[in-house]
């Protein structure tokens, strides 16, 4: 039908799907809302995947994908309070089981650093931690340099109640010394 598809952007959509299906369904739901409001041009679809941008469109070919998923769309995002359902994603379920095992009495008070390329994935992991009453802090591009050091210091403190340090791969960088964590999870790959 003459439409062009950017393969790399479609691959990114599939990477989000492998992180958790609600990340794709959220975009699908927002896409449908935009179409109803007439804000989306039918002739050309621009696909943008920037961290946390609520104006992102779903990748070409992903429109309507939420009807195949085991939930109503829109369960991703920072402001959402819907249950995370780690069992819907292999990676999320393994992370959940690892963290649950870490919190068992007698396991030495392990702490974990979790790195993701997508702030939306960090949103879901943060909600999972909140649902399980696991203390966590989150460092992404919105955190000032002054606050970053306070977060790092608190996480590194052995008496801290923080279990997880959620880190955006694009916000990390020079000067982060996360010696308080004895486990590291790179949640999704990057090119």
Q: What does each of the following model-derived ranges do?
A:
Residues 2-164, 170:
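Conserved Helicase C-terminal RecA-like lobe
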